[in-house]
Amino acid sequence: MGIQTATASDVAQHTPMMQQYLRIKAEHPGTLVFYRMGDFYELFFEDAEKAARLLDLTLTQRGASAGNPIKMAGVPHHAVEQYLAKLVKLGESVAICEQIGDPATSKGPVERKVVRVVTPGTLTDAALLSDKNDVYLLAMCVAHNRRGVATSVGLAWLNLASGALRLAELAPDQVAAALERIRPAEVLVADTPGDAASWTPPVNAGALTRVPVWHFDIASGTQRLCDQLEVAGLDGFGAHSLTCAWGAAGALLLYAAATQGQQLRHVRSLKVEYESEYIGLDPATRRNLELTETLRGTESPTLCSLLDTCCTTMGSRLLRHWLHHPPRESAVAQARQQAIGALLEAPPGAGVDSLRGALRQISDIERITGRLALLSARPRDLSSLRDTFIALPELRAQLAAVSPNADSLARIDASLEPPQACVELLRRAVAEEPSAMVRDGGVIARGYDAELDELRDISENCGQFLIDLETRERARTGIGNLRVEYNKVHGFYIEVTRGQTDKVPDDYRRRQTLKNAERYITPELKTFEDKALSAQERALARERSLYDALLQALLPFIPDCQRVASALAELDLLAAFGERARALDWVAPTFSPDAGIEIEQGRHPVVEAQVEQFIANDCSLTPERKLLLITGPNMGGKSTFMRQTALIALLAYVGSYVPARRAAFGPIDRIFTRIGAADDLAGGRSTFMVEMTEAAAILNDATPQSLVLMDEIGRGTSTFDGLALAWAIARHLLAHNGCHTLFATHYFELTQLPAEFPQAANVHLSAVEHGHGIVFLHAVSEGPANQSYGLQVAQLAGVPNAVIRAARKHLAYLEQQSAAQPAPQLDLFAAPMPMLLEDADDERDSKAEALVPPAMQALVERLRGIDPNDLRPREALDLLYELHELAAAPDADH
């Protein structure tokens, strides 16, 4: 049994301070306790060992308690944020235990309490948060039938930094996609026994925290949510069909409030999300399209990194949300594109550039508001909030010139009206450039509080008093080099050099002796010292009290601050979209109620930004042309063409302009991709199993309004199995799903599909051979490709020439055999077919030799017998003529 899990009787054996620590630790099991002692946060026992390992701290042992040495590790209080950030990144939670009692008046250990708990999903401090990423805490409540099988899952997730709360209720098989979209930092689940849990969260759920089952009670959750939102019922939020989502919301709010140690004053609204509201993007699609993260796990180059020229971090975070939540309703996208068009067509002084210049002066008031609601806002948060509000009139004046041309801009303009009472309060109360921390003083503006001003005057007039006293004492004592000074250790003093001490008056009292001087204090100086130091301490205490009262006074303005923050984020993102459209030559797409996708001269937005020249291509998918069979060489651009089609469609529905000459879209409900594959070792699935699982999801869920991207389906198994599966899948997509499909393949047998299904069409990526090499044209043309150029691509990849030669010879053999008679399916364990070995062994295979003309054999033999280093110039010239004659022989042309 560890010392931290000691029983009550064991605790009594410890020192009073350790008893206090163990009681606090018992209330926070599984959490590192940062226990404040003076200027340090200390960790003890197992916590100390763990923190020393994770944070690379020195582990020490000091003294003993209950007969055991006390293991300790500590971090300075002024640098605690950097340690918290590292621990949270590692998925740890930390309880911050502060001294709340006065050491001077405490009997026994100073009173301490946990003031907040920092967990991966409840971050609000600027030092712990990524500027451009939201952090979500999510709770998951599972409903079961009588047999214990999960039937539905209620989700509630909260961005504590902004106060945004959302709910959803899904089928169990939809949860993985939802978690991929939300990306929660921490997930709350019921702490149920392992044998009673019939369903466990997916592996991408984030840091798991188990809480008591009763936290998820649906009735209690409903009441807790009503209390939080200050409403009598929840029907007004469009959530009448939910059940277990209420339980998830209750557990979420209970946990979040407990970690903060106070009410969540900024959580005042609720949004219920339904699957039908957004274009469906499964986890594979989000990864393959590289919306916010590359396949290598980096943030650039991605669609988000290309689009993110936002001037505020609020706009950057909203961009990520929009990319992962493209609305199905085209009216939303059209409204955004109308706003972008109005900004691009605005008169000078009111367009994209001027608005973006004004937006650069805006602070992250969304997160400032969150900290204000939790009473953790720092002085510079308040000055930033004030300065942002002061800058709004200029921004609104520019916006007024274009807002009549777009309903979205008019709505944003109206939402940018700052709360004037809040602005005036901040103007009066907060210093122009306040200190970083309240404890440093200089936070409250002069003129706001008469008592504080008086105390400051006493403290700040010390300099003049000391100058006057020094002048008087020099005249009184006749000591010309006498000095009156102050330091934090000894306070105020009069310094006299050792050679002048005989002139010191009787009322001087020695305070400190130095090597070459003596320091004294007089009754007058002592009286002033008491008054000045007392005034400084009282001023800091008064300022702390005023600051706390100011935070309370600002709480009623939180809804207004949230309204302004939301409008600023949207305006910033629309302006960024406008800047991207202009800089990258993008156009506004159009929408139609009729099914189809028409893209003229479309480009891949991310790839185009990485290369000097990009070949644009058309894509036409209509009710009469549902499936495009795409053939062509590897590296020819098939995957790029497919991805760019999906990205252009996604951008259109997000509300951005798109990289094309023209683009038109009908309704799209989901986008599926089956591009590339890797095995899932953790899940025990092979590459082919992953491929088939993704294909199954598409075949089961795709509708006539879905866009499907299929790349090289069936390649993970034997040739005929793969071909048969690819053929059947393509047929099913046409005959049953009826979805818009881009189907890339190397199975040329599939190019016969349009003969059976007129809704299928062949296109190919062009390439031309140059010697034994290949030049990719990256242009999409009608009709099937005539070959796949696999050997040329292998040569480009650096495959040794000997291997390429052997492959080329064996390819010729296979083609000859295929022309002569049908070839059996290749089998991994069958006896090898006759084939040419490398180098000298190649020539011993008579069947392969028969494919090479005699003159060409003679030419090769002659070349192999030449050592260029032994040739003289004349010999080299004669040899060149000889080789030319051999190559010109009639049967040498092969």
From Swiss-Prot:
Please list which residues make up the signal peptide: none
One GO CC annotation: cytosol
Q: Which SUPFAM superfamilies does the entry link to?
A: DNA repair protein MutS, domain I, DNA repair protein MutS, domain II, DNA repair protein MutS, domain III, P-loop containing nucleoside triphosphate hydrolases
Question: What are the UniProt keywords, alphabetically?
Answer: ATP-binding, DNA damage, DNA repair, DNA-binding, Nucleotide-binding
Annotated ATP binding sites:
632-639
Q: Name one GO biological process term.
A: mismatch repair
Q: Pfam families from the xrefs?
A: MutS_I, MutS_II, MutS_III, MutS_IV, MutS_V
- Highest taxon of source: Bacteria
Q: What does this protein do?
A: This protein is involved in the repair of mismatches in DNA. It is possible that it carries out the mismatch recognition step. This protein has a weak ATPase activity.
Question: What is the protein's given name?
Answer: DNA mismatch repair protein MutS
